[in-house]
């Protein structure tokens, strides 16, 4: 998520084992009051607020980055929640929706194609825009030679390296310069690596048949909680193992919700309780996810499922475009001298200038790329039908 998955997933059906309340009432004095609807019953992929939540989370990432990109720092005890919960929420939603995607259509080729089409085309175009438009504009604003930058190998090298997520190639010929956070044109790309690894994990689990049962999700989640707790220190120095534990744990929490969706009650009271747990854990624990990964996933997924208002059903998913274009636009704002603004004001300006790029990315790139999924699916199934038909024809006695 990367930031931005789940489009096109068929509606999740209600649990067929849930009896009608009148039938239960007729069974006699042993009846129990129903606990209310489950997540499976309230979640409708055609009418939900998950796209709204993802856009909110992407905007939260802009707010989070407005501190370091203006040369400021978020101080304890609010730093953990403020700097991590937004992306963690993305991964939790993704864990729920990606698991649903595999269960709905457990074909590896189509799964890989769908994930690649969601992430890569938008990313590649974004890299080209950064290298050949945003970076030269930034150089020109600072009095440098945009033509010299464009004639060098640096823009092409930036695109090629980051296109395969070699994200350590963060700058373009040393730019951006003379800003509070120099040398990095898009500081969110590294999270896409972990998103892709989570996609791979779902594919491996699906091929192995582990998504057909509930217990593997429980075992994996418990192991990740232990792993995440063990690598939580030192807190001030983020290691690769801490990153793995962080993203894998919240993604697994979303997947766990999917696997138990017909058992999990969907109530606003539990959403509120989950939010309180996330807040308390974020303020009191060095790694809030050890206690609050499931509450975070519950809060964002179930609240999104409970909201069925048509106006909050976004047909356009701008969250991915906002996510990948916001940092370079914030750097450009800093180059223009706006880093003196208070971070909240800086974030508002960044949202305003980023949304048009996100909209162009969705309508011109991402949406068109996603439309190819149906073509790939029809071709794959058409080829399978031809092979199957040929096998039947060539079988003696058929």
Question: What do the PLM-derived regions correspond to, one by one?
Answer:
Residues 2, 14-15, 20-41, 133, ...:
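C-terminal "closing" transmembrane helix and its immediate cytosolic amphipathic cap
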Residues 46-103, 120-123, 322-327:
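Functionally critical transmembrane alpha-helices in membrane proteins and complexes, commonly lining
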Residues 217-226, 269-279, 319-322:
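Central hydrophobic cores of alpha-helical transmembrane segments
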